[in-house]
Amino acid sequence: MLSGVTLWCAIWWVTEPVPVPATSLIPLAFLPILGLLDHKATAHSYGDSLILLLMGGFMLSRAMECTGAHKKVAIAVVQGVARLGGHGGRSVILGFMIATAALSMWISNTATTLMMLPVALAVISGSNDKKFAIPLLLGIAYAANIGGIGTPIGTPPNIIFMGAFDKLGIRDEPYGFLEWMKAGVPIVVLFVPIAWWWLTRGLSGKETFNLPKGEPWTPGQRRVLIMFAVAAGLWI
């Protein structure tokens, strides 16, 4: 019966006869009815602390997307790095990769990539270097995946690992947020430059780029950034 419920959910997730979130509620209704799990244990799984942690990350991601705060952060980082490198192609790509990795540590990899693409495409459209587009787009994709390693909420598999690690009872204390960052952030710091060097090794770096100019921060963007900083501080 459990296999049947699992197969039912899988088929509906793929075919989407109802919204995906609605399909996710099937176990909540049918596991108790079929006697596979009591209703309290089933509901407790939906309210697990790690699920709520992931939900909080998604809410922050949505807030940044709606207000456009992510673009302000990205443009500021890219401009800062590019300024140090004379606005050459290699420095622009490094700026995009650093901004993407930094955002991806707190927002899902896919969402971060989608957020960065419009800014990157605007820069590409003003470039005459045919070799510039591919390293930039691949750099954003790679940096998003690398950045997702930095924090537990960077990507859902991190949360799944934390939950499995705690349930295995390998040690008495749970695997904490800060403890994850101590292991994950050095990996991000190491591999972003390595990926950048590999992707840009064929670029001449002679062309300079005009980056989008940052606009003043709106009150909504400031509030989202403050909430983001408070949430990150409390998580750590």
What is the predicted function of each stretch?
Residues V20, T112-T113, N158, W180:
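General alpha-helical segment detector with a strong preference for membrane-spanning helices
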Residues A22, I26-K130:
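Membrane-embedded alpha-helical segments and adjacent helix-loop junctions characteristic
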